[in-house]
Amino acid sequence: MERKNSLPAANALLLAVVALVGLNLRPFITGVGPLAASVSAETGLGLQGMALLTLVPMLLMGVFAFAGPSLQARFGARRSVVAALAVLSLGSFLRLFVATGWQMLGTAALLGLGAAIVQAVFPGIVKLRFPRHVGLVTGLYSAMLMGGGALGALMAPLIAAPARNWHAGLAWMAIPALLAAVLAARCLPRDGTPQAGGRAAAVLLKRPRTWLLMACFGLVNGGYSTVVAWLAPFYREHGWTSASSGGLLAIMAVAQALAALLLPVLAGKREDRRPWLWLTLAMQAAGFAALAARPEAAPVLWAALLGAGLGGCFSLSMIVALDHLPDPAEAGALSALMQGGGFLIAAMPPWIAALLHDLTGSFLAGWLLQLACIATVTWLYWHVDPRSYESAIRPPTLRKELPIETAPSA
């Protein structure tokens, strides 16, 4: 259990970096939905083509998350994060000039690459710099990540409307990404001796627990990617405007941010996080069931329920992965692998939902698919008992592969 002593004042600037980095990892995804009609009309992307704007970044977040431990060992965490944030800024800036579907997909790939590297490396930095406050700082990081999603959904139509140009509604995101790169370069600690994250990753891939965490993270985030891609178009089909449907997505993201920040604090009072994970899954199930059965009854409430469930589950999933190992490099490697496999899984549901929509003329089947995924994750998390962490990661016959190390104090 985490100690409750206060964070040193010297870490305040580093916490600002945590917040600003998290803020930049979702706007480029959530900003597309409210502008989907305009983007589709100019680039020629159909419903399944628009789904690729979510699928491609998610795939890259998965593929390059596996490379995170090796990048950190070879280039260092600080250099990797700064370079990735610069790539995020460039990808958003290039959206000022895209005119075709392929160009739009190219920027999505560039943005997914930048976000993937940050997400793979950054949890290890949190574990290293704040070992006694992993839950609190991970909650802040996750909350800002979700808050960035709200910002993207809200600002994209607001900036695009007066400019009468959807390009501006997406390209403005280059500014906070560049600011985050500059602040990270100045404030993140210098890279020291290379750590053993790459070797740990190879060993962890042999553990069934790693694959279980991947499956849980992927199925839950498949719900997130589906909602981000199709909640606004879903309500556009019900007669909502771009701004109002984007506002609904922003409400969902705000609820995500609040839950991502608050639930880790509440869950930190006990070692077993599963009751809180099951609570978040119940909220997701209620939200998706409501979208399927009564979408117009209380849209704001449905969006808030989904957001709270998705945001809280994301944050707690990250903490559970970091809880498994005391060493920052090894814990970061496990988190990167969980995200790698997870995002590969999460990339597919938006495209599947688009395909089902083309076949049935409705998003109903897509919402029902997410209910099945939630039921699966609820059962899988039953096996993630904190008493099993040690044996699941370091079986008695293989403990020499991952020697126990002690994290530095913050």
What are these regions (language model features)?
Residues 117-130, 312-326:
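Intracellular juxtamembrane helix-capping segments at the cytosolic ends
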Residues 32-33, 208-250, 255-260:
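Extracytoplasmic gate region of multi-pass secondary transporters
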Residues 64-76, 259-272:
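Helix-to-loop junctions at the C-terminal end of transmembrane segments
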Residues 132-136, 140-189:
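Helix-loop-helix hairpin linking two adjacent transmembrane segments in secondary transporters
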Residues 44, 76, 97-102, 131, ...:
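Helix-breaking motifs and short loop linkers at transmembrane-helix boundaries and internal kinks
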Residues 63-102:
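Conserved MFS/SLC helix-loop-helix module at the cytosolic interface between two early adjacent transmembrane helices
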Residues 325-364, 370:
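A late C-terminal transmembrane helix in Major Facilitator Superfamily
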Residues 107-143:
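Cytoplasmic helix-loop-helix junction between adjacent transmembrane helices
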